[in-house]
Amino acid sequence: MYGVSPLLLKAVAQVESNMRPHVVNSTHTANTQSQDIGLMQINTRWLRRNLIKSLGYTEAHLYDPCTSVKLGAWVLANNFTRHGASWEAVGAYNAACTRLKGDACRRARNGYAWKVYRAMRKSS
């Protein structure tokens, strides 16, 4: 989907929600006014983006596993466009680095990418 490997999507879902489609992460709501929802833990900030908004997606859609994977693939594809086909792009799925900068951003992205890599190795 969007040119993103199904194995990568499965690994991200494993890391993000442990394959549970109804998980909600509200730990950063106070700081970001957003939540991560569903199988791929799509951040509700994505719903404010013009393309996603124009497609009519709402918070309720994020609980649907198929929609969650579709939007997760879209986010990853956009990351690959911005960062190249790299583990940094995978890390950016979880660490957008709007607040983290420099080495702190790189550490967060590398740590997340490593988790996804290990999940991919386990499932293959």
Residue ranges of each PLM-predicted region?
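Catalytic glycan-binding domains that act on GlcNAc-containing polysaccharides
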Residues: M1-S124
